[in-house]
């Protein structure tokens, strides 16, 4: 009987291990992340700040980067860069899935400003899921003054113009359009449909 219970326990542990998956959504400390279960691709955007400049009334330092990669089982390789930067400026790293909807990210070198906010090279940085969101991709705007539309036909534009580098959570893709939500630091949720041609390409 003991052997039977032990066997059941081991099987359950293995099932729990392999059933773990990355959850798309908003994580702690300024991380937004999306995971496409079909392709195994993970995309994300980290944006955090520290310090306070009394003269300008803004933060002194900022750490910002976009990343993408693929995940198999619980580990993945990512490439990170500032939205719009060229490929030679990218920094590789690793993403690893933890327990209880946590994950860690570690980069081979620091992005500008990150050392004063959060180091990603000394040790893996841990993030906890704050809110699950049904995103399959996170992408950014590559044009300037880009329109958002009311539907996937693109017949009626909203009174919104997105500047270059705006980061979006993508939930649905239909034809040449994607339904998206603008990721920013305000409580206002701006949603609409955007042309795929106005977004960074997914290799």
Give the residues covered by each predicted segment:
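Sec-dependent N-terminal signal peptides
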Residues: 3-13
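Sec/Tat signal peptide C-region and signal peptidase I cleavage site
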Residues: 14-19
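Central antiparallel beta-sheet cores of small beta-barrel/beta-sandwich binding domains
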Residues: 20-100, 106, 115-131
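SH3-family beta-barrel domains
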Residues: 23, 40, 115-155, 160-163, ...
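Short, exposed beta-strand-loop hairpins at the edges of beta-sheets
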Residues: 183-189
